[in-house]
């Protein structure tokens, strides 16, 4: 039977084949006529790429069917260069986890069992209850709202 192969340039070539011929045989016949090596050929029929081991009958290719020949593209994307950085990477801060850290804000009197606060609590309504102020050598400072109480300094 006779089939047609449409090449990349739009030229149509005719091949004399049997329905029992494999795709490999068809590619070899195309190589004889066009000089394109079989490993670079891709044959398309009815929108499907034809695999080398199968026969023309497997794909229901009948007489005067047209196959489309396209070339196989080799390779992939362009290799990218590795970036070089001028500054070393910044080391992230590690959170220091202190077990039972709340105990440093309170003191329990041994004799009476009374609990007293060691730190001053921020009076600002925005901060809410339980927000303690930091003790500095000359002031109390709230880290949440920025409220600062400075100690009286004697001249």
UniProtKB/Swiss-Prot annotation:
GO terms for molecular function: mRNA binding; protein tag activity; structural constituent of ribosome; ubiquitin protein ligase binding; zinc ion binding. InterPro entries: Ribosomal_eS31, Ribosomal_eS31_euk-type_sf, Ribosomal_zn-bd, Ubiquitin-like_dom, Ubiquitin-like_domsf, Ubiquitin_CS, Ubiquitin_dom, Ubiquitin_ubiquitin-like. Residues 1-76 form the Ubiquitin-like domain. One of its GO terms (cellular component) is nucleus. There is a cross-link at residue 76 (Glycyl lysine isopeptide (Gly-Lys) (interchain with K-? in acceptor proteins)). One of its GO terms (biological process) is modification-dependent protein catabolic process. Keywords: Cytoplasm, Isopeptide bond, Metal-binding, Nucleus, Ribonucleoprotein, Ribosomal protein, Ubl conjugation, Zinc, Zinc-finger. Ubiquitin is generally synthesized as a polyubiquitin precursor with tandem head to tail repeats. Often, there are one to three additional amino acids after the last repeat, removed in the mature protein. Alternatively, ubiquitin extension protein is synthesized as a single copy of ubiquitin fused to a ribosomal protein (either eL40 or eS31) or to an ubiquitin-related protein (either RUB1 or RUB2). Following translation, extension protein is cleaved from ubiquitin. It comes from Oryza sativa subsp. japonica. Pfam families: Ribosomal_S27, ubiquitin. This is Ubiquitin-ribosomal protein eS31y fusion protein.
């Amino acid at each position: 039977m006779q089939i047609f192969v449409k090449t990349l340039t739009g030229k149509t070539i005719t091949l004399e084949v049997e329905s029992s011929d494999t795709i490999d045989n068809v590619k070899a016949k195309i190589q004889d006529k066009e000089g394109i090596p079989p490993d670079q050929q891709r044959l398309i029929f009815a929108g499907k790429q034809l695999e080398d081991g199968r026969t023309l009958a497997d794909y229901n290719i009948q007489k005067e069917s047209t196959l489309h020949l396209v070339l196989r593209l080799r390779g992939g994307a362009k290799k990218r260069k590795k970036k070089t950085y001028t500054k070393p990477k910044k080391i992230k801060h590690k959170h220091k986890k202190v077990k039972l850290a709340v105990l440093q804000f309170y003191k329990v009197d041994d004799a009476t069992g009374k609990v007293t606060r060691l730190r001053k609590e921020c009076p600002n309504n925005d901060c809410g209850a339980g927000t303690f102020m930091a003790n500095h050598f000359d002031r109390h400072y709230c880290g949440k709202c920025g409220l600062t109480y400075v100690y009286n300094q004697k001249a």
